[in-house]
């Protein structure tokens, strides 16, 4: 390396496909259209509804309503191995700051009014994920006199995550399904 060589690194080309020598996704029509629009105008044109839906799916704030052993798996989801925040979701302590409530565990008759009260404190649009057999339908304690046979009898549920207890991967998949549902249905009421 002499004094005449530049000290600037060459521009990154991304991941190179060994078969073609081109960057991966270079011939993808979706990204091609976006690149063409950005290079032509310098900005993208979209509807406000698509922008709001994109922002909602990428910044879901969830609050835990952990009632039993499923709450431990919910904590695993936030830990470094699974790192739920890379999908744009982060835990919040207050229902007034959250979009999603994850109900995990056995819901009893005494706890049902508290669940409804917390749900009512959440701002619209609000979503509920029912996590585990106990939250879905009473689970192992289904026939007990004090157990609500599914949290969907108290609050409307958007996504059901099965299992006893469900794994952290199952909860992540449920969260991704919720993001897909939000993208599909939108959030603006007309």
From Swiss-Prot:
- Its predominant location is membrane
Q: What is its EC number?
A: 7.1.1.-
* UniProt keywords, alphabetically: 4Fe-4S, Cell inner membrane, Cell membrane, Iron, Iron-sulfur, Membrane, Metal-binding, NAD, Quinone, Translocase, Transport, Ubiquinone
Could you list the residue ranges forming a coiled coil in this record?
A: none
The free-text note explaining how the cofactor binds reads:
Binds 1 [4Fe-4S] cluster.
User: What biological-process GO terms show up in the record?
Assistant: aerobic respiration; electron transport coupled proton transport
Q: Which residues bind [4Fe-4S] cluster?
A: 69-70, 134, 164
Species this chain originates from: Chelativorans sp. (strain BNC1)
GO cellular component, alphabetical, reads: plasma membrane; respiratory chain complex I
Pfam families attached here? Answer: Oxidored_q6
In UniProt terms, what function does this protein have? NDH-1 shuttles electrons from NADH, via FMN and iron-sulfur (Fe-S) centers, to quinones in the respiratory chain. Couples the redox reaction to proton translocation (for every two electrons transferred, four hydrogen ions are translocated across the cytoplasmic membrane), and thus conserves the redox energy in a proton gradient.
> What is the name listed in the Swiss-Prot or TrEMBL entry for this protein?
NADH-quinone oxidoreductase subunit B
């Amino acid at each position: 390396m002499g004094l005449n060589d530049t000290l600037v690194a060459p521009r990154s080309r991304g991941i190179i496909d060994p078969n073609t020598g081109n960057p991966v996704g270079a011939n993808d029509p979706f990204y091609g259209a976006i690149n063409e629009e950005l290079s032509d105008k310098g900005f993208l044109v979209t509807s406000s509804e698509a922008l709001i839906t994109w922002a909602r799916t990428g910044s879901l704030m969830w609050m835990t309503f952990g009632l039993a052993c499923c709450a431990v798996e919910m904590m695993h989801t936030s830990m470094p191995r699974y790192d739920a925040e890379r999908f744009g979701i982060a835990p919040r302590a207050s229902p007034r700051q959250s979009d999603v409530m994850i109900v995990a565990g056995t819901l009893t008759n005494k706890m049902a009014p508290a669940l409804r009260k917390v749900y009512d404190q959440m701002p619209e649009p609000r979503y509920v994920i029912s996590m585990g057999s106990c939250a879905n339908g009473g689970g192992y304690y289904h026939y007990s006199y004090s157990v609500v046979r599914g949290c969907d009898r108290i609050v409307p549920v958007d996504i059901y995550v099965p299992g006893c207890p469900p794994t952290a991967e199952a909860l992540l998949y449920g969260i991704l399904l919720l993001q897909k549902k939000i993208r599909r249905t939108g959030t603006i009421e007309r």
